[in-house]
Amino acid sequence: MSSSESSSVSGGGRPDAGRLPGEEQAMPRLDTLISHLVAAKRSLSSINHVWRANEIVTAARAALEECVVVSARTAFLRRGLNNQLRLLYSVRTEVEEISLRGRSEFAAVLKDLDDADTRLRRTLELLRETIVHPAFRPEGEDPKSLHDFVDERGVEELHAALKSSIDRTTAAQAQLDSSNHAFDDELLSIKEALGTYRTAAKLASSRSSSSASSSSTSNSSLPSISTMPSMLHSLEMHAQEMANLLESLVRHFDLCVTAVKHTEGGGAAAKSITGDMPVGVPVSGRMGSNIEEEINNNLNAPLDPLSNSEYQEMVNVLFKDAAEAEDVVMEIQDRIGEMESVLENVLAQRDALRSIYNATTDIYQHLSSLGSTRLPGYIAQAHNFTQVWHEENDRISGGLADLSDLNSLYNGFLDAYDGLIVEVARRKHVRQRVEKVLRDTRHKLDQLYEEDVTARETFRVEKGDYLPSDIWPEIGREPMRIEFRRISGAKVQAVNLQSPNEQEAITDEQKTANRLAPVESKDGDEIIPDLPRELVEQAFARLKARAKDAT
């Protein structure tokens, strides 16, 4: 729109003197000029868009400043959070490894205990099933098993001690599991907060991507603020251009007022039309000036006289500008619409950054609370379980060794009983051999005695009458007789079957000291049980099988 105006001339209206007929026909009608003045006045309402443009620029600049601060704070917190999260998950992994390692070791020890206890119970059951042969016991006594000779109080006490250790370890493990579950709940809560953070970041990234003129998508987890300065610059350019366009509308309005006032009868109309002008605001590029003030000054200013040519030139410019005024108004509206859209994107990015910052601070506060209050408890619970397990593992290992010793003792008892049966059979066999030797010897001694008696009697008959009786007093004595006398064997130290650890080796001197001197048996021969051959063969087979298993 041209800013040309007519030259200043004196006079309040167009003079009639000297006007040519053609010139009068070419002059515009007053109502036409008034319609242009009314349209120019209406176009000045675009000043509201310019005022809104200034508000948008101010709001966008404040949003950009806030985004820079929030983005910097968020980036700083994220770096700290990444380190804390790595440390937190490392602690959780270590605590879980302690739990799994302890659980595995405990399960292995329990399996060993179960195996040892099963072997011991099987041995005890064999003791119950093994009935002592009645030949070993006094006549009339109720049947007894080998288990009747075993004191199980040691087994019961050992089981009680092992149960106490197992219960304590199980309780410590349950406490650790509960602590780990609480730890997992903490991590789940943090994971949910991270999900909120990622959702906000994804939303912000999509908004940032959609607001950019480029078609490429953003993969950043944080919305980029690199596009916001260009947006702000675009808004400032729009605001500046809108101010310039508004100035051109003001100049067009001034020109319309001047033209109407220079037209006969137009002064009063100009004052009537311009009596209720919109409140003006400072226009960019013209800081310190006010549109309303400027218009009022123009309305009240005295008119300078114009020549016909100057007037005609002014009218031509007015008509040309009037044709463009509507386009200028539309351009201002388009620009304010574009600015509103850009501001919406800027504020959306600011809100997204706020959401990310709030999510980040929530995670940071959660981690801070966790690290200062609950995390030390989770770590302490893992250390407590480790300490309890080490203590009870030593006790359980000792109990496992005791179970093995008891099983060995009772297996030795079973083996000794089978050995006793074989020993009885051996002694029976020896006794039979001794009796045979005694019978054979008695028979030979009796033969020798009879032969000696016969020979002595023959000698006495043949030679006795010739020998004086005092030549040898023993000549008439009968031959000596030999008798066998049974002597009881000395008793040896009894064998203790209750505690192999308390048995001590007996030296030869101790054996000699503990052995009683042989005495004549007053109760008859040693009683050797008469065992069935089948029983002896079974005992011998078991001994042989155990010896084979041992190798």
UniProtKB/Swiss-Prot annotation:
Pfam families according to UniProt: ATG17_like
Annotated spans, Disordered: 1-25, 204-225, 502-524
InterPro entries: Atg17, ATG17-like_dom
Record carries keyword Ligase: no
GO CC annotation terms, alphabetical: Atg1/ULK1 kinase complex; phagophore assembly site; phagophore assembly site membrane
The UniProt record lists the keyword Membrane: yes
The entry's keywords: Autophagy, Cytoplasm, Membrane
Record localization: Cytoplasm; Preautophagosomal structure membrane
Principal place of residence: cytoplasm
GO terms for MF: molecular adaptor activity; protein kinase activator activity
Lipid bilayer topology: Peripheral membrane protein
Tree of life domain: Eukaryota
Biological process according to GO: autophagosome assembly; mitophagy; pexophagy; piecemeal microautophagy of the nucleus
Transmembrane segments: none
Residue stretches of biased makeup (Low complexity): 205-225
Protein family according to the UniProt entry: Belongs to the ATG17 family.
Function description: Autophagy-specific protein that functions in response to autophagy-inducing signals as a scaffold to recruit other ATG proteins to organize pre-autophagosomal structure (PAS) formation. Modulates the timing and magnitude of the autophagy response, such as the size of the sequestering vesicles. Plays particularly a role in pexophagy and nucleophagy.
Protein name (database record): Autophagy-related protein 17
Organism: Aspergillus fumigatus (strain ATCC MYA-4609 / CBS 101355 / FGSC A1100 / Af293) (Neosartorya fumigata)
